[in-house]
């Protein structure tokens, strides 16, 4: 059983966590238009390699992960999807609290902690967003957000086997986000952790199903379209220091 769960997580990583997660408005609150102005251009010096890996990942996604997302879409109603989305968002709150703490933003750290406590208890394990109704909102934070907070730019655009699309700054997120900085990983059973990760990945893939289908069917260059969408959305989800200026490499790809 554990092997099946691990396999599901690996497959679900192909087109969600790194590729398109940041494109979905329910996952991130895009409030950093100044960041888009600072890092408007995509630095893609490894484009030839990236395109080959993108094609490889896309085939695996079409064979394995997309059918799971389509099945999830067809077999669950909107009410259940909303509960799963709320549950997944709540599971991320301890990680968000840790990253806000690393950013020395203690107000948002405590809001994230209380949001997790309220939704886990009154919200029945996070199935209902009770905290949001009383004004306790919190934008999801990863280690990449923390690095950006201290002035680390996105760096080169990368497409990695299995992991998917990312950049030099965010490429460690799968490790730090899912394990090293996530308190739940130290206090829950391994089977529970793996099950939650699998559900989270499938939920993420479903959230971008319409977008990815449209791009793959209609875009003349799906690679460039997804690269641009991911870069813009990710840059809008991070907050750089005041007066931060994104480095401008000689060879860049404009959005």
Swiss-Prot record:
One of its GO terms (cellular component) is membrane. It comes from the Bacteria. Residues 1-18 form the signal peptide. Keywords: Signal. GO terms for biological process: intermembrane phospholipid transfer. Belongs to the MlaA family. This is Uncharacterized protein RBE_1331. The lineage of its organism: Bacteria, Pseudomonadati, Pseudomonadota, Alphaproteobacteria, Rickettsiales.
């Amino acid at each position: 059983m554990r092997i099946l769960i691990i396999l599901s997580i690996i497959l679900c990583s192909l087109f969600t966590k790194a590729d398109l997660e940041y494109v979905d408005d329910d996952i991130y609150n895009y409030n950093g238009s100044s960041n888009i102005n600072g890092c408007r251009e995509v630095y893609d010096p490894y484009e030839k390699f990236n395109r080959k890996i993108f094609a490889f990942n896309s085939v695996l996604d079409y064979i394995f992960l997309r059918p799971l997302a389509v099945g999830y879409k067809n077999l669950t109603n909107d009410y259940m999807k909303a509960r799963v989305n709320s549950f997944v968002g709540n599971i991320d709150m301890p990680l968000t609290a840790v990253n806000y703490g690393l950013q020395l933003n203690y107000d948002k750290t405590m809001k994230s902690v209380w949001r997790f406590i309220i939704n886990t208890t009154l919200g029945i394990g996070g199935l209902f967003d009770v905290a949001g109704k009383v004004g306790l909102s919190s934008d999801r934070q990863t280690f990449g957000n923390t690095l950006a907070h201290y002035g680390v730019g996105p760096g080169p655009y990368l497409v990695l086997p299995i992991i998917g699309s990312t950049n030099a700054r965010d490429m460690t997120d799968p490790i730090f986000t899912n394990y090293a900085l996530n308190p739940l990983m130290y206090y829950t059973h391994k089977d529970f952790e793996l099950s939650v990760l699998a559900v989270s990945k499938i939920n993420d893939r479903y959230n971008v199903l319409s977008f990815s289908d449209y791009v793959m069917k209609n875009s003349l260059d799906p690679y460039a379209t997804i690269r641009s969408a991911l870069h813009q959305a990710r840059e809008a989800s991070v907050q750089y220091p005041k007066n931060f200026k994104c480095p401008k490499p000689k060879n860049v790809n404009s959005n």
